[in-house]
Amino acid sequence: MFTIKEEIANAITHGIGVLLSIPALVFLIIFAANYGSAWDIVSFTIFGVSMLLLYLSSTLLHSITHKKTKDILEIIDHSAIYVLIAGTYTPFLLGPLKGTLGFTLLVIVWSLALGGIVFKIFFVKRFILLSTFVYLVMGWLMIIAVKPLYASLSGAGFSLLFLGGILYSVGTIFYIWKKIPFHHAIWHSFVLGGSAAMFFCVLFYCVKVPFLS
């Protein structure tokens, strides 16, 4: 259970995410339309919508006190983490890694995401450590394709991708370390940082942007 102050901090941190995700989605679509293909438009949109879904569901969860509504939002919020992970993968797998490897990984991560969502529907308040472990495994599955990714993204793009992964991963420490005051808001802050790194990586390096060439 969170204190009132903690819930306010939880809502504010991801409320900021909602406000940033809306223009982020617009920029993603514009860049994909101007510099990418139809597949890039689809994949960038999926990524942007997955960010917005995560931050919106989280903000609502921490803002509403009605128990039944909160229980439903908790399922959506936890499920949205799986969606964000798979959504973040999508621009890379349909862009820089497109082909057999990209398609295979795409099927794997979205299958894991769907499995995770079904799991959360039934066990949202249980097996937290297991869920966190699955989040991390899904997130770092990309290491399978580290060589072609580095070749496609360049050093700067790959650094942003790696930074995003590190921020998300370090943040999970505070997600499960419940004895620290405001631990959940701290985790939210790491999620924001991870999303920012992934956003700029996708925006500038998953399509060929002329002014960075």
From Swiss-Prot:
TM stretches of this protein: 11-31, 41-61, 75-95, 103-123, 127-147, 157-177, 185-205
Keyword annotations from UniProtKB, A to Z: Cell membrane, Membrane, Transmembrane, Transmembrane helix
Coiled-coil stretches: none
The UniProt record lists the keyword Transmembrane: yes
GO MF annotations, alphabetized: pore-forming activity
Subcellular location: Cell membrane
Membrane disposition: Multi-pass membrane protein
Domain of life: Bacteria
UniProt xrefs under Pfam families: HlyIII
InterPro entries: AdipoR/HlyIII-related (IPR004254), Hy-lIII (IPR005744)
Family: Belongs to the UPF0073 (Hly-III) family.
Protein name: Hemolysin-3 homolog
Taxonomic path: Bacteria, Bacillati, Bacillota, Bacilli, Bacillales
